[in-house]
Swiss-Prot record:
Belongs to the HAD-like hydrolase superfamily. Cof family. Its EC number is 3.6.1.-. Pfam families: Hydrolase_3. Catalyzes the hydrolysis of 4-amino-2-methyl-5-hydroxymethylpyrimidine pyrophosphate (HMP-PP) to 4-amino-2-methyl-5-hydroxymethylpyrimidine phosphate (HMP-P). This is HMP-PP phosphatase.
Length: 272
């Protein structure tokens, strides 16, 4: 029996309309009744996740910013990792050959250089939003991560540019088809979950995790039981071919799987 359950949010726990379904909320409560510790492992900001958590009346640890921060049940920082200031400075100030928009994150929020209302749709549940600012004015020593949002093919070309400029001083990953993230070197959900597991006196073998994108790869590949969403990026399924694929987030597949796991732990699972 797993003792710690880690959940990605977008494309996993959240439905396509970016809300949590009733069945999902009820199933999370059942896990807590079984004394299974919960953690939400997401690229979203802790300020947003605290608001979401407050609406659920659930105790959960928070792994946010794709592993750049870990917060306790009481809201205390258990772990923090920022981008190398030189890396942040280079990314923010260089004239990259891309049409993608740049987004900078630190403990104070989400910052971008122009209004992009379409990006707010993913945050309708919480009301969290960006602040429009001159990105070059942000102190480089306070940056947790930087994201680029745009066309996937354009982002693939941008990743080549970033890799050449970073010289392995940062971790690059796709948190969605249209979002490329620049993270601190060695920082990902898997490494953060290892820190949290150790803090709780557990091993990664005691954990189960759910995800759908390449920023979930390390987490899913390192736990005792990793589950991939049916709507996952094809690259993730190809990277972890030994892991089970469950149903679609639109059908609350995490809840469907966990209900079966709680009620019939010894029977094989089918997403149908």
């Amino acid at each position: 029996m797993a003792r710690l359950a880690a959940f990605d949010m977008d494309g996993t726990l959240l439905m396509p309309d970016h809300h949590l379904g009733r069945e999902t909320i009820a199933t999370l409560a059942r896990l807590r009744e079984r004394d299974i510790t919960l953690t939400f492992a997401t690229g979203r900001h802790v300020l947003e996740m605290r608001h979401i958590l407050g609406t659920l009346s659930l105790d959960a640890y928070l792994i946010t910013g794709n592993g750049t921060r870990i917060h306790s049940l009481e809201g205390d920082v258990l772990h923090r990792q920022d981008l190398d200031p030189q890396v942040a400075d280079t990314v923010m100030h260089h004239a990259w050959d891309t049409r993608a928009s740049m987004h900078v994150f630190n403990d104070n929020g989400w910052f971008t250089g122009q209004e992009i209302p379409a990006l707010l749709q993913a945050h309708v549940y919480s009301g969290f939003r960006y602040q429009v600012i001159n990105i070059k004015s942000i102190p480089a020593h306070q940056v947790t991560k930087i994201c680029f949002c745009g066309d996937h093919d354009d982002l693939i070309r941008l990743r080549i540019q970033l890799n050449e400029a970073m010289e392995e001083r940062a971790h690059l990953c796709f948190s969605a088809v249209d979002c490329l993230e620049v993270l601190p070197l060695g920082c990902n959900k898997g490494s953060a979950l290892a820190v949290l597991s150790n803090h709780l006196g557990l091993s990664l073998a005691d954990c189960m995790a759910f995800g759908d994108a390449m920023n979930d790869r390390e987490m899913l590949g390192s736990v005792g039981r990793g589950l991939i969403m049916g709507n996952a990026m094809p690259q993730l399924i190809a990277a972890l071919p030994h892991l089970a694929v469950i149903g679609h987030c639109g059908n609350q597949a995490v809840s469907h799987f966990l209900t079966h796991w709680l009620d019939n732990p010894h029977l094989p699972y089918s997403p149908e």
